[in-house]
Amino acid sequence: MFYVWILIGVVYLDYASSPIRPVLIVTCRTSSVALCEHEIGNVLFIKDPDVRVEKTAFTDVLLVYSNLDVNTAYRVASFREYGFVESIIPIHCTSTLPVDPLFLRKCLAEITSPGTRVKLKVRARGVRKTSSEIYRLVVNILRELGIAVESSSSTCLFVEVIKSSVYVGVGSCKPVFKASISDS
């Protein structure tokens, strides 16, 4: 069970009081959201019967809530064949806009290591100009932490903004659906 607080018209979810929290962002093949929702839900249900998959305000984008640790959920979900899931992004850290540089620095220090090479993918849905500002901020923090940004890296650092929520995670750059098709 989690608590919802409403403060000045903004809803805050207290994930600390509940083990269920956002662990994955899933993008779906165009016009296949219902099937994609069932696919990802069925895969994770085996490990977590409380898994919840929610549509976002954006076409073909889902948020997955689970009791599982983010790395376990990502591992379970990533190594499956899918017909309708396009990509799976782990959520290691969450925040809200505007992004606090101290939060971002702490998050990036926890999920990366000095000497690591990452491909940086920043996507802001529903907020103009935010992605370029966040991109610059993340690049500067990564530089301070001794992490190289390389477009050829197979490890991606994802920073996803959905409305006013910011999700940060590290995972494979390989899209799940496309990987399954090309590997067969």
Features from the language model and the residues they span:
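SAM-dependent transferase fold signal centered on methyltransferase-like domains
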Residues: 2-184
